[in-house]
């Protein structure tokens, strides 16, 4: 009997299997994150150490809360946990993820060899394991990182089955430890991927037809006798029944828990994901049945593989006269013949065929649309476990053929060719997964009727900023599938990126017109993929660039919200718009509503902080910045802007934290000069002159024309008695910004006081007055130049005019008195001193300090409103053509105020001026 066969394998066999896997998949280590990997890895915050572990058990495979309708309801927390371990080791470097996938595939192949030993002889089981290890259909499961769900689930799937095979003791007694272990392993397999639960069916078939050796006729005979009262159920059959009941009850419990996890809701898919699922009878049934031979053909002939089989890949079968129905008929005839053979006849061969069929059929049931529609037409990676049964069937058939001496050599040649060609195909197929562009271009070679593939190639080109070429692919997608809302949205977004706003709006309007019309009393969520509602967001984001259409944009946001009150992105985008419309209180309401829907979104807390800045509530703004950083300690804009807010507050106790955040910011953004500049400003506030100099130099090195960094470095030199070092810095500043008033003032002061270059200083001050005749500081300093040139009357007249501009400046009055005293003592005849054009008090002017002050960076990044992209519910975010635009205008707050407080160096400068005027 099969159950009596040894399942042991030796080290040489393990080494051979592992070596073959390594030879086939070594090049997968050089592939990146593509297709579904983007959503599951790059965009999944559950991988980050800052996310609590319990969140893994509350969210789906893609990081979306299971309670949200946009969730795919794919509950695989243990798989996500392995991704998190990868992230802990290498963050987002893809090589470690691909390496672990390859290791898992090798482990599955070795365990599969052990399972094969239960049904096949040593040679045939090795052949089955080798066929499984090299089969090209597995490329998507192994080279695609998200395929780890299949790999992990298969490990525990096979382990559970092997455990169950040990549940039969002497004299047909029940050994409970393996059964308990089986139930545990089934639960673990199911937490890796849902199809893990189907191993229970495999165990039941094994128990009845292999372990107990029953055939279908025997079972019918016993059942008939029992029902007629002519016999009783044998003890062995009762023991079998007990084991089956335990398995069934445990399975039922797992199903109940799984249903509770998804809150009795199925995911929402569009008709583009699985067209047959929304087709009428008999189209739906004919197409679903035809998909079975399609999947079988992929196992038999994996020459044309495609990463995406949705949309128009397989045209619907709408008539019984469709020739493809012959393939369905032939498939069921072959399957039926094998089924009858395996169930009717005793013997090892029939039991091997039966177990192979069960391994092919039962794990495929969740993806078969039998009980519920799925979000794809064909998916190669779901064939990972079913291919085990296929490989057993092929190996068993080869064993039968090779036993005939006439065909023995030919069978070996054919088998060797199959294994070699499959291995080479797998190796070559891995390169297709190197990047998104190579992957989707390879798919288009197989299938040109899938609009999603055209869209995805467009996305890949879009990511490379090749918008012109991307547009061609997006337009082709609309031609292949004219009613694809997402394709039209992609066209609109690309037109926008090409600054062709009129065409962009037309494309968005066309996409909007394809949305289902209002049906009273019917929820939109039940009929529309949530991402399709982003057409309202994208259209509003486009038209709000026109100041006269802000209300129209707001109407679109409100329309989206009315259709889905839980549409978080609509609240976020509307909040941005309301800030632009100078309605911060309403913007605050919008963000608070969004936070009700997602309190763990760091970007939302950041945006709310910006609103509080607009409302002039810096303390509340800082609290919200802090909340954003609690959720995401590396949130770059929150680090930067909260540090600036602390710096502006003037509170000395906040400076260390501000410095810490800026240091974290420059670690995250080492090429951003603003971070170094603001560190320099903090150091200047703390009188750490050498440190300030170092930070300013780093900022200037990264951005040679950084106006504020250049000026403040020059100012720092002037305040630390290094005026001559300041001059070349000022020359550089004025080369880029020849009208920089403060730079001209500082340069003039240094030329006059340090270089004694009176004409040079005079040119600086005169240029200031050419640009701004009312500049008090420039005019006052020009008066000092006149005094230095011994033009006392001119100096007096100049000071009178300056006093008219700033009548309350005591130092100007004092300097005027000094000049007049000098005129009197020198005996110069005094001319009438009427103000030049203005008299004091005739015009109200801004009071301008006479001393140099620090200039706060005008290049320093203003606070920005962040847009939050939550379009993960299409597993392929690249294909998720419905994404809201990423480049909406950023909302800025008022420019950061200049620091007006007088500094010690400025006081020294004033003393120097008075010393000159006193003739000392």
UniProtKB/Swiss-Prot annotation:
TPR repeats: 451-484, 485-518, 534-567, 568-601, 602-635, 673-706, 707-740, 742-775, 776-809
Keywords: Endoplasmic reticulum, Glycoprotein, Membrane, Phosphoprotein, Repeat, TPR repeat, Transferase, Transmembrane, Transmembrane helix
InterPro entries: TMTC_DUF1736, TPR-like_helical_dom_sf, TPR_rpt
Positions of the UniProt region annotated as Disordered: 829-897
Keyword Transferase: yes
Pathway: Protein modification; protein glycosylation
Cytoplasmic side: 1-14, 116-125, 164-171, 220-236, 347-358, 403-409
Oxidoreductase recorded as keyword: no
Compositional bias per record (Basic and acidic residues), positions renumbered to this chain: 840-858, 887-897
Residue positions, PTM Phosphotyrosine: 508
GO cellular component, one term: membrane
TM segment ranges: 15-35, 95-115, 126-144, 145-163, 172-192, 199-219, 237-257, 326-346, 359-379, 382-402, 410-428
Membrane topology field: Multi-pass membrane protein
Any one Gene Ontology molecular-function term assigned to this protein's record: dolichyl-phosphate-mannose-protein mannosyltransferase activity
SMART domains per record: TPR (SM00028)
Subcellular location(s) of the protein: Membrane; Endoplasmic reticulum
Top-level EC class as recorded in UniProt: transferase
Residues linked to a glycan: 499, 546
Function according to Swiss-Prot or TrEMBL: Transfers mannosyl residues to the hydroxyl group of serine or threonine residues. The 4 members of the TMTC family are O-mannosyl-transferases dedicated primarily to the cadherin superfamily, each member seems to have a distinct role in decorating the cadherin domains with O-linked mannose glycans at specific regions. Also acts as O-mannosyl-transferase on other proteins such as PDIA3. Involved in the positive regulation of proteasomal protein degradation in the endoplasmic reticulum (ER), and the control of ER stress response.
Family: Belongs to the TMTC family.
Protein name: Protein O-mannosyl-transferase TMTC3
Originating organism: Mus musculus
